[in-house]
Regions:
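Positively charged n-region of N-terminal signal peptides that target proteins for export
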Residues: 1-6
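Central antiparallel beta-sheet cores of small beta-barrel/beta-sandwich binding domains
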Residues: 25-135, 141-159
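Bacterial N-terminal signal peptides
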Residues: 8-19
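Bacterial Sec-dependent signal peptides at the C-terminal "C-region" and cleavage site
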Residues: 19-25
Length: 159
């Protein structure tokens, strides 16, 4: 899998699951709707790093149990667009995603609890683990993976 595609898969999965713990009384996606932007750093297999810029747009279902997301990210060497659909049922997260310019997609699953969200993301020849936290209008994402893309740390804020 190419470096750009691996990065797109991991970063996109992380962003689509940026769930807010402060809205636990309703569905886990309540309060997430809108546009979020931010920056971070990606670590590659050879130890090098690249800065990345992202913009996520979230549409939340009426019961706040479903999320549709579009994510645009870019670094100095590539860009990508990811779309995702995520459902929450009793603290269990599941969904699908696709990267439109590379015609690839996969599944995701995980658990939410105590303000921490642990998610496994998969596609053919790619897996990643994500840890997510949201506090008010700020989101932090930490990603770990094997292969050409080793990980990322990204901070977002709501516009």
């Amino acid at each position: 899998m190419s470096r750009g595609l691996s990065t797109a898969c991991a970063v996109g999965a992380a962003m689509m699951l940026s769930v807010s713990a402060s809205y636990a009384g309703a569905g886990p996606f309540e309060g997430l709707a809108g546009v979020w932007t931010g920056r971070g750093t990606i670590q590659l297999e050879d130890g090098s790093t690249e800065k990345i810029r992202c913009k996520a747009t979230y549409a939340v279902s009426g019961d706040a149990q479903g999320l549709n997301q579009t994510l645009l990210c870019a670094s100095d060497s590539y860009k990508f667009e990811l779309k995702s659909n995520v459902l929450a049922q009793g603290g269990v997260l599941s969904g699908t995603w696709s990267e439109t310019s590379r015609n690839v997609g996969g599944t995701l699953g995980g658990r939410a609890g105590n303000g921490q969200f642990n998610v496994d993301v998969s596609a053919p020849a790619f897996t990643a683990k994500l840890k997510l936290t949201t506090n008010g209008n700020r989101q932090n994402v930490v990603i770990s993976s094997e292969g050409q893309f080793r990980g990322a740390s990204i901070s977002l804020s709501r516009s």
